[in-house]
Structure formats: structure tokens, C-alpha cells
């Protein structure tokens, strides 16, 4: 068993209300009131309407304090904020809006405000995404600028504090190279000196004695004995304490035609002076006094200068 019907549905009119029906219902309620019984009210007025339909028509449309027309922007914001907070509880939302019924609010929400809110949220979401993308782009640009600045500073530091290790075109001063080459090991200096002496001696002999070139084979022994005498490590050149000069070599080997001329003696003296000036850094002189410089002095200069250099 269910609840008894409020009216005879066969004799009840359905559909929209006419202006005459609205006027009858409004005038009766304003004069007599509802009486607390909406079921018996249609029979008293003479309307072929259901009691529920009369109640809803009065509450939603015919009351004197109801607002008709569109919703203001402030009302829309209140409806949206309350809907996001409590959902579709229209009676509670209508209590916050004087003059608005829950039915009007629900209809307005479903027809217009819902779409408007969705579009607004979509636009805000797009704007937030755009702002986030712009922030990401700005952060990337700042990061790239920082990387460029750091790399530039590192390059400046490398160019300021890094010594060029692989520069093959660096020009070393000639004076330093000459001094370095002059203070080499004596075992490497002696053969070069002897070779130069012999070569210059041959050139001088060809100029002074053109027929001497034919006797080169006979003079080779003299050159060899002179070279071996200088290069022999077992021979004590400086052990006797006496000056081992070029004059002693000239007097010892009298058979050689190279040592019998005054020009040769003068050439050996000049060569000694040039050799001493080469190791000491002084200018070359060809005076007759420098011809008395001994090989002992040359050896002492070579050893002392090489020790100081190394």
C-alpha cells in the first residue's frame, strides 16, 4: 500500500500556467492564505490543478519578494563558489541569495552558468599553462646565459693562467742559444773544435801553398796524430802543471809541413783567441798577445762555465 494520491489525475490539468490561473491563485493566497493545506486549496479556488503544482507555482513565481530577470555578476560568483564547495545543494545556495528560489538557481545553472564556468576554468587553465611555459622558457634562457658566462670566464682563466706548452714557433734569443750551445759537454765540444781546426787549416794551406793539395795523403797522418793527441782521454794534458800550449805541439811535430810556417803559428794563435772569446762571451780579437793562450786555460774555462750553467 502506498500513499493516497493528492488529486484525481484524470480531471487535473497539466502544462504551463495561464495568466488567469496565476491571478486567481495569487489573489486567494493574499486574501485568505494557504490555510496549511495545499491539497484542498485548488478545490476552494476552483482550479483544475494539483495541490503540489499550486504550491510550486506560488513559491517559485507568484510570491511578492521573488526577483525576476537575469542574475547579476555577484550572484553568479556566489553560485559558482558555493557549487564548488558544497555541490548541487540548491536550497542551501538559494538561502544565500535573497529573492532567488532554488528552482531558478538550478535552471540558471544548468542552462547558462555551467557552460560559462567550464569555459572560464578552461581559459584559466590555459593561461596557467602559458605562464608555466613562459617561466620554463625564461629559466632555460637564464640557464643558457649562465652557462655561456661560466664558459667565457673559464676560457679567460685558461688564457690568463695556462702556459703555452706546444708553441713550436716561439723564438728563443740567439744569445741564450749560443750560450747554451757553448756550455755543452766537453766530450761533444772537442771533436767539433778539432774538425773546424783541421778544415780551416786546409783552407789556409790551399791559399798559401797551392801545391800542398797534392800532398794531402802525406799530411793526413799529421792531422790524425794531432787529433788523437787532443782527444786521447788517457793522455794527461793538464797533469804536469805546465802550460800545454799550441807552441809545444808545433815544436813536437816538426816533420809536418803544416807547422813550419809563421802564418800557421799566427793562425793557431788567432784560433785560440777566438775559442776563448767564444766561451767567455767577449768579442773576437786577432792580436799577437792572444796567441799565447794555452789549452789548459781553455779547458778550465769550459769546465767552470759548464758547471755554472748546469
From Swiss-Prot:
Matching InterPro entries: Homeodomain-like_sf, Myb_dom, SANT/Myb
SMART domains noted in UniProt: SANT (SM00717)
Keyword Transcription attributed: yes
Keyword Aminoacyl-tRNA synthetase: no
Tissues expressing this chain: Ubiquitous.
Organism: Arabidopsis thaliana
Result of altering residue 131 to D: In strain: cv. Se-0
Protein name as it appears in the record: Transcription factor RAX3
Taxonomy of the source species: Eukaryota, Viridiplantae, Streptophyta, Embryophyta, Tracheophyta
PANTHER family, alphabetized: OS09G0431300 PROTEIN, TRANSCRIPTION FACTOR RAX3
Predominant subcellular localization, coarse grouping: nucleus
Ranges of residues in domain HTH myb-type: 9-62, 63-117
Record keywords, A-Z: Activator, Developmental protein, DNA-binding, Nucleus, Repeat, Transcription, Transcription regulation
Regions recorded as binding DNA: 38-62, 90-113
Biological role stated in the UniProt entry: Transcription activator. Positively regulates axillary meristems (AMs) formation and development, especially during inflorescence.
Superkingdom in the source lineage: Eukaryota
Entry's localization field: Nucleus
Annotated GO MF terms: DNA binding; DNA-binding transcription factor activity
A single Gene Ontology CC term: nucleus
